[in-house]
UniProtKB/Swiss-Prot annotation:
It is linked to Epilepsy, idiopathic generalized 11: A disorder characterized by recurring generalized seizures in the absence of detectable brain lesions and/or metabolic abnormalities. Generalized seizures arise diffusely and simultaneously from both hemispheres of the brain. InterPro entries: CBS_dom_sf (IPR046342), Cl-channel-2 (IPR002244), Cl-channel_core (IPR014743), Cl_channel_volt-gated (IPR050970), ClC (IPR001807). GO terms for molecular function: chloride channel regulator activity; voltage-gated chloride channel activity; volume-sensitive chloride channel activity. It is a multi-pass membrane protein. The keyword Transport applies. CDD domains: CBS_pair_voltage-gated_CLC_euk_bac, ClC_1_like. This is Chloride channel protein 2. It comes from Homo sapiens (Human).
Length: 898
């Protein structure tokens, strides 16, 4: 029974997150479940089953008296008040956040470097045997990746992937269950360390944004124990925005680029009041991160992470700008291709049902096979010698940013034997062939590796590929102009490292659709000499990539089916002529103020949305407010609850025994008690409120209809009602209902609960036909909404609102639906689904009135149709002294709404 109850208790959680082979996937009713849970808790519904009761000490033993703990708590509270009064709560939070993230980043880098050194040590120690060296080279990353995938899957599947797409969704207002918890933080940190320590082409920046956000959420919960602003949940969003900047800042020691990058990838509209928070926390975190490197004697002083030494007097010539522009345009196409390839890999694996089902049963097989393939191809004595397979990502960037020219004669003799630059010039190949093979192989390897179900990002692999492409162009320019470019009797040699910097920023910007990668590159290299070529290449790459594909993070949002709102895009002027009346759904699920419970049940059958519109009457359709689905379910469940049926039975029994009695309530039954064997599961307490309790715990109920009925005394699960179950399973005929009830009774023979019951309970059994008749009578009664929490001012739009203004409002306010009204009359509803289809140009004709091509040929001088005008006149009233308001043009209505 405990195992069954545990399985039922875990069932609602599966509605939030669905683990797939590569990426996880969230369902469409993501925020609805969280709000239903909040409504259940607020209304005092039954708690989910959490296992057998544990033997805890008495509550009085947990109270603190005059002990040392009490004195420590008083002292900590006084210190907190002193610091808050002198420094301020925001500064304390941001300092702690920056310090913790710097420590986490430095410890992770130290562990990753140790893992990579261990792999190199094993490979060099077994160089006498190629077979043993290959086995060591392949087994090491396979073990680490398998452990990372298994550990993440067991502890917190939400830790899989980058984290930036989910943070973008969370900052928009969507609630993702268990995404910012402690166990997800542990799974993300350990899983990311093992994944990066394996040497796979994976990144750190995206997961670190998620780690910083989790750290900020946990820190807010901890500091809320002391009171203050941390108890305000609306403040958490501002702290999460600052945490995203800290994640990038302490990852690359790039505070300015980190703040700008976090704003670009997570926000559509950014609150300027959070600007200083991000800069302060990111700067402090980057400072501590580099100080720890100096303390560990990794660096002599605080320097850039990949310091370059380009010449400053003449870094590039004006004639080289076309080459930089070519890098930007090519990077734009390459970034779009990378996003397309990454999404196509996931879609192909999902469409192959047989392979997908097999790999879903063997979850660790897919990451192991991918790691085995990539490790085999990068084996240094094998094919890896033609793509610098022995170099890590950090060593690869250091060599690619080198300002020396590799194709110059005599370079190999000048390089020292242990130099890592020799990896790009193997004995049986040249620099150009090695760079081409490296770019092609790393391109599809990175797109494939980022689909492994482990914590990983794609920024750093793309950054390295872009640097290699820029280096290829730079080496080609150096080969074409071996003596450099002559300018005013002066000769300046080509610097291939500058081309690598430009290529890295351009390709990373094309994949992420950001311009701040240019600033990140400047902070990474410590030089700003190539600012003009970098900006030109990044802008051109973004222009090309944004016209072809969405960003990598938006692509993952679509793969995971997270709620999102696409951008309007460029050059689509017809979108500015589309109005809300062209895209709204006219068949709005609603309930009237004078409706019956049968109407409530029909409304719940018609829609799966989390909100229902409340109107005055079906004729007038005057919008009075909105009511949550959980509230409607609670009303219907209370009307058909076992408590009401028990009361009905007692009243009928009282009428039969004493028909001449004038008492309104039923008489108290006799107190004779006997044992009752109950074979049904129930989520409610016994009918009698005495100290007698069942000897075995009741099983948790499955349907969500009875969640909010915990305060009413109820009976068995059979008394939940056939009509109530038909809300989710359809309305069966009486014969089928009785057969189903009998089969359920046979299946529940093993679920025995011994309890104490009165003789009145034993005599009050109703047949299924009587239950159906009683429920039909209850469904015909009118609904009383006085006990419901109704939103009296739901968000509304008028039918003449433009698509551009609607998109801006949805983005700014973070709403997911809006009712469309005309002089208070409900005429439609617009949700994220309709808005997304209108923007993407794929509006269907199901319930949506669209005039192709999206009302672009609408006559702006024409008003509404005759039917609508007649209805508005009738609603306005024939005896009104004022005339009907004139309907202006779209531009006029937009100006008035501003």
């Amino acid at each position: 029974m405990a195992a069954a109850a545990a399985e039922e208790g875990m069932e609602p959680r599966a509605l939030q997150y669905e683990q797939t082979l590569m990426y996880g996937r969230y369902t469409q009713d993501l925020g609805a479940f969280a709000k239903e849970e909040a409504a259940r808790i607020r209304l005092g519904g039954p708690e989910p089953w959490k296992g057998p009761p544990s033997s805890r000490a008495a509550p009085e033993l947990l109270e603190y008296g005059r002990s040392r703990c009490a004195r420590c708590r008083v002292c900590s509270v006084r210190c907190h008040k002193f610091l808050v009064s002198r420094v301020g709560e925001d500064w304390i939070f941001l300092v702690l956040l920056g310090l913790l993230m710097a420590l986490v980043s430095w410890v992770m880098d130290y562990a990753i470097a140790a893992c990579l050194q261990a792999q190199q040590w094993m490979s060099r120690g077994l160089n006498t045997s190629i077979l043993l060296q290959y086995l060591a080279w392949v087994t090491y990353p396979v073990v680490l990746i398998t452990f990372s995938a298994g550990f993440t899957q067991i502890l917190a599947p939400q830790a899989v992937g980058s984290g930036i797409p989910e943070m973008k969704t969370i900052l928009r207002g969507v609630v993702l269950k268990e995404y910012l918890t402690l166990k997800t933080f542990i799974a993300k940190v350990i899983g990311l360390t093992c994944a990066l320590g394996s040497g796979m082409p994976l990144g750190k920046e995206g997961p670190f944004v998620h780690i910083a956000s989790m750290c900020a959420a946990l820190l807010s919960k901890f500091l809320s124990l002391f009171g203050g602003i941390y108890e305000n949940e609306s403040r958490n969003t501002e702290m999460l925005a600052a945490a995203c900047a800290v994640g990038v800042g302490c990852c690359f020691a790039a505070p300015i680029g980190g703040v700008l990058f976090s704003i670009e990838v997570t926000s559509t509209f950014f609150a300027v009041r959070n600007y200083w928070r991000g800069f302060f926390a990111a700067t402090f975190s980057a400072f501590i991160f580099r100080v720890l490197a100096v303390w560990n004697r990794d660096e002599e002083t605080i320097t850039a992470l990949f310091k370059t030494r380009f010449r400053l007097d003449f870094p590039f010539d004006l004639q080289e700008l076309p080459a930089f522009a070519v890098i930007g345009i090519a990077s734009g196409f390459g970034g779009a291709l990378f996003v397309y390839l990454n999404r196509k890999i996931v879609q192909v694996m999902r469409k192959q049902k047989t392979i997908n089902r097999f790999l879903m049963r063997k979850r660790l097989l897919f990451p192991a096979l991918v790691t085995l393939l990539i490790s085999t191809l990068t084996f240094p004595p094998g094919f890896g010698q033609f793509m610098a397979g022995q170099l890590s990502q950090k060593e690869t960037l250091v060599t690619l940013f080198d300002n020396r020219t590799w194709v110059r004669q005599g370079l190999v003799e000048e390089l020292e034997p242990p130099s890592t630059s020799q990896a790009w010039n193997p004995p049986r190949a040249n620099v150009f062939l090695t760079l081409v093979i490296f770019i092609l192989m790393k391109f599809w390897m990175s797109a494939l590796a980022t689909t492994i179900p482990v914590p990983c990002g794609a920024f750093m692999p793309v950054f390295v590929i872009g640097a290699a492409f820029g280096r290829l162009v730079g080496e080609s320019m150096a080969a074409w102009f071996p003596d450099g470019i002559h300018t005013d009797s002066s000769t300046y040699r080509i610097v291939p490292g500058g081309y690598a910097v430009v290529g890295a920023a351009a390709l990373a910007g094309a994949v992420t659709h950001t311009v701040s990668t240019a600033v990140i590159v400047f902070e990474l290299t410590g030089q700003i000499a190539h600012i003009l070529p970098v900006m030109i290449a990044v802008i051109l790459a973004n222009a090309v990539a944004q016209s072809l594909q969405p960003s990598l993070y938006d692509s993952i949002i679509r793969i995971k089916k997270l709620p999102y709102l696409p951008e309007l895009g460029w050059g689509r002027h017809q979108q500015y002529r589309v109005r809300v009346e062209d895209i709204m759904v006219r068949d709005v699920p609603h309930v009237a103020l004078s409706c019956t419970f049968r109407d409530l049940r029909l409304a719940l059958h018609r829609t799966k949305g989390r909100m229902l519109a409340l109107v005055e009457s079906p004729e007038s359709m005057i919008l009075l407010g909105s009511i949550e689905r959980s509230q409607v379910v609670a009303l219907l469940g209370a009307q058909l609850s076992p408590a009401r049926r028990r009361q009905h039975m007692q009243e009928r029994r009282a009428t039969q025994t004493s028909p001449l009695s004038d008492q309104e309530g039923p008489p108290t039954p006799e107190a004779s008690v006997c044992f009752q064997v109950n074979t049904e599961d129930s989520a409610f307490p016994a009918a009698r409120g005495e100290t007698h309790k069942p000897l075995k715990p009741a099983l948790k109920r499955g349907p969500s209809v009875t969640r909010n009925l915990g305060e009413s005394p109820t009976g068995s699960a059979e008394s939940a009602g056939i009509a109530l179950r038909s809300l989710f399973c359809g309305s069966p005929p009486p014969e089928a209902a009785s057969e189903k009830l009998e089969s359920c009774e046979k299946r529940k023979l093993k679920r025995v609960r011994i309890s104490l019951a009165s003789d009145a309970d034993l005599e009050g059994e109703m047949s299924p036909e009587e239950i159906l008749e009683w429920e039909e009578q209850q469904l015909d009664e009118p609904v009383n909404f006085s006990d419901c929490k109704i939103d009296p001012a739901p968000f509304q739009l008028v039918e003449r609102t433009s698509l551009h203004k609607t998109h801006t409002i949805f983005s700014l306010l973070g709403v997911d639906h809006a009712y469309v009204t005309s002089i208070g009359r409900l005429i439609g509803i617009v949700t994220l689904k309709e808005l997304r289809k209108a923007i993407e140009g794929s509006v269907t004709a199901q319930g949506v009135k669209v005039r192709p091509p999206l009302a672009s040929f609408r006559d702006s001088a024409t008003s509404s149709s005759d039917t609508e005008t007649t209805e508005v006149h009738a609603l306005w009233g024939p005896h009104s002294r004022h005339g009907l308001p004139r309907e202006g043009s779209p531009s006029d209505s937009d100006d008035k709404c501003q």
